[in-house]
């Protein structure tokens, strides 16, 4: 039975997979994201997030036990917000998140997520596929008090673009165009397509990784 491994610490990505019938093994990736971004100074946004996703999945593969790597698919993802031609990652501080919201309030931007799925059999890589997906997010304009309160929760500090769709930040999203799971950090339609390329059935994954 094929084990699903999620190479991410994101509670949002974990929730998406759980709600879709899969309880993955979580192995948090350990890569230097800044170095990877710096190595792609002129690359298009989709290539940057895909490179990050590939690095994360590849790093996780190296740390799997023999039993976990016997029959598995390893998922790596990375999301960034494309606004005014610039990729925005996790703000990391209240001040940075506040500046981000000042820039994007009342505007639209694209949340771009890179996906990588690596297929393992008997500890060997037998498939490696990638894809990116974009969803347009139309932001509302939170009042100064609401924004301050939101920033104080800490939620937007460690997520791409300083917002969540599936959390408190959802109050300040007017609408989206595209796949909502992509905004949360892992697109189910993209994953399904990647699994199909690897000849892996979603139904089989439900059976092997069901909650």
Swiss-Prot record:
GO cellular component: cytoplasm
Swiss-Prot/TrEMBL catalytic activity: a ribonucleoside 5'-triphosphate + H2O = a ribonucleoside 5'-phosphate + diphosphate + H(+); a 2'-deoxyribonucleoside 5'-triphosphate + H2O = a 2'-deoxyribonucleoside 5'-phosphate + diphosphate + H(+)
Keywords: Cytoplasm, Hydrolase, Nucleotide metabolism
Cofactor(s) listed in the protein's UniProt record: a divalent metal cation
GO biological process: nucleotide metabolic process
Molecular function in Gene Ontology: nucleoside triphosphate diphosphatase activity
Subcellular location: Cytoplasm
Active site: 78 (proton acceptor)
UniProt-listed InterPro entries: ITPase-like_fam, Maf-like
E.C. no: 3.6.1.9
Function text: Nucleoside triphosphate pyrophosphatase. May have a dual role in cell division arrest and in preventing the incorporation of modified nucleotides into cellular nucleic acids.
NCBIfam families for this protein: maf
Family: Belongs to the Maf family.
Protein name listed in UniProt: Nucleoside triphosphate pyrophosphatase
Upper lineage: Bacteria, Bacillati, Actinomycetota, Actinomycetes, Mycobacteriales
């Amino acid at each position: 039975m094929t084990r699903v491994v999620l190479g991410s610490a994101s509670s949002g990505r974990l929730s998406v997979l759980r709600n879709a019938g899969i309880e993955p093994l979580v192995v948090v990736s350990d890569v230097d994201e800044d170095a990877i971004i710096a190595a792609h100074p002129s690359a298009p946004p989709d290539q940057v997030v895909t490179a990050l996703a590939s690095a994360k999945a590849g790093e996780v593969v190296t740390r799997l036990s023999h039993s976990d790597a016997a029959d598995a698919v390893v998922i790596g993802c990375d999301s960034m917000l494309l606004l005014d031609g610039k990729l925005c990652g996790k703000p990391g501080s209240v001040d940075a998140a506040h500046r981000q919201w000042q820039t994007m309030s009342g505007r639209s931007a694209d949340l771009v997520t890179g996906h990588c799925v690596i297929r393992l059999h008997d500890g060997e890589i037998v498939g490696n596929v990638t894809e990116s997906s974009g969803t347009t997010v139309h932001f509302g304009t939170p009042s100064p008090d609401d924004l301050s309160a939101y920033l104080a929760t800490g939620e937007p500090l460690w997520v791409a673009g300083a917002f969540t769709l599936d959390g408190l930040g959802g109050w300040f999203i007017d609408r989206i165009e595209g796949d909502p799971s992509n905004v949360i950090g892992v697109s189910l339609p993209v994953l399904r397509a990647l699994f199909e390329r690897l000849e892996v059935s979603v139904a089989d994954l439900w059976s092997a990784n069901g909650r």
